[in-house]
């Protein structure tokens, strides 16, 4: 499955929640997509369908392809801790996600573009791999020549989210990935245990 680049609201309506963040269009049309969306009832789904839907929601939320997501699950399974929680922690430690959380980009899709276009450094070195995994203590910054980019400045000026596991200095346009977030510090509405059950079948 290729990375989805179509209308975000359509996908959000499929899951019944704004999985990509604030979405005014979703708020106006909070029902399944399609010609008979308003008439459709979210009927009872099979256990497999519920588990699959949760996995798809996580993949769309973080913008991760199936192969990458499966690899993250395998890594989480081999790591000490609760597998589902570790899986989400690995997703949160991706560079594109941290760039999004820091407010450098308004969405993870935008964060991937910023990283891919070489606007971000990690510990002083340019990193253009969105899936790059950060370690506690890593410093993430906007590249010097990119600090005046309108898209970045606009995103930072509109950002109001504060997370305990990252710091951000808006004057220097740099921050630190302080620690791996605990599950309670991850705001995503994902039932990770359903994903674990699906992959363990």
Curated annotation (Swiss-Prot):
UniProtKB keywords: Ribonucleoprotein, Ribosomal protein, RNA-binding, rRNA-binding
Q: Name a Pfam family for this protein.
A: Ribosomal_S4
- Any single biological process term in GO: ribosomal small subunit biogenesis
Stored InterPro entries? Ribosomal_uS4, Ribosomal_uS4_bac-type, Ribosomal_uS4_N, S4_RNA-bd, S4_RNA-bd_sf
Query: Might you report a single GO cellular component term?
Result: small ribosomal subunit
PROSITE patterns per the UniProt record, alphabetical: S4 (PS50889)
Give this protein's Gene Ontology molecular function annotations: rRNA binding; structural constituent of ribosome
Locate the S4 RNA-binding domain: which residues? 93-153
Report the record's disulfide bonds: none
Family according to the record: Belongs to the universal ribosomal protein uS4 family.
Instruction: Please explain the role this protein plays, according to its UniProt record.
Output: One of the primary rRNA binding proteins, it binds directly to 16S rRNA where it nucleates assembly of the body of the 30S subunit.
- Subunit comment: Part of the 30S ribosomal subunit. Contacts protein S5. The interaction surface between S4 and S5 is involved in control of translational fidelity.
Instruction: Please give the name of this protein.
Output: Small ribosomal subunit protein uS4
């Amino acid at each position: 499955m290729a990375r989805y680049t179509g209308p975000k609201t359509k996908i959000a309506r499929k899951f019944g929640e704004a999985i990509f963040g604030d979405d005014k269009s979703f708020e106006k049309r909070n029902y399944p997509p399609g010609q008979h969306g308003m008439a459709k009832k979210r009927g009872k789904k099979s256990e497999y369908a519920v588990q699959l839907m949760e996995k798809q929601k996580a993949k769309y939320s973080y913008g991760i392809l199936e192969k990458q997501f499966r690899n993250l699950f395998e890594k989480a399974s081999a790591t000490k801790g609760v597998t589902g929680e570790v899986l989400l922690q690995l997703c949160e430690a991706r560079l594109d996600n941290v760039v999004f959380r820091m407010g450098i980009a308004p969405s993870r899709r935008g964060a991937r573009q910023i990283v891919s276009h070489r606007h971000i450094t990690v510990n002083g070195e340019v990193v253009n791999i969105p899936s790059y995994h950060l370690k506690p203590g890593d410093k993430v910054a906007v590249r010097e020549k990119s600090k005046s980019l309108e898209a970045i400045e606009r995103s930072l000026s509109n950002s109001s989210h504060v997370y305990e596991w990252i710091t951000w200095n808006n004057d220097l346009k740099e921050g630190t990935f302080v620690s791996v977030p605990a599950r309670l510090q991850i705001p995503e509405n994902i039932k990770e245990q359903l994903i674990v059950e699906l992959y363990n079948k």
